Amino acid sequence: MKIEIKRWGDNDLYTEGQLIVNGKMAIPYTVEYHDNKVQTGTYEAWLRKKGEKYILYFKDESGNERMFIAGHSFKSAWKEQAVVVGDHLIPGAVYRGRNHLARLINRLSKAVKARKKILITFSEDEMQPTNIIRHWAGLKNHARG
């Protein structure tokens, strides 16, 4: 399973982006704070169960273990915001994140059960945030009819 964070926006505090899984958009809006930003590159990830909580970890360029996403269970993760701290990567925290997080965690669960390797890639992209929001708004309107 390939997870990609495409970064496209930047300000003095954080970098905006989107999360793509196996070539398809999974979470349309991510925020990554500058004080602990991950360098571009590909990292191998693994899933751990800690009590009732599932956590996806990866090792960064310095060899530090970093948490990527967490949820109390694959089925109830949508109830939580996808906040990843220590690690300062927050998928979907701003725009329609909870539903997307639940789907992503379910997909990760299936990949782990199938013993598939999980790779996370961080890359830079030229896409603008307004394009993302327009894209998702268009899909929403299209679904209505």
Task: Report the location of each language-model feature.
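Cell wall/extracellular polymer interaction/catalysis modules
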Residues: 1-145
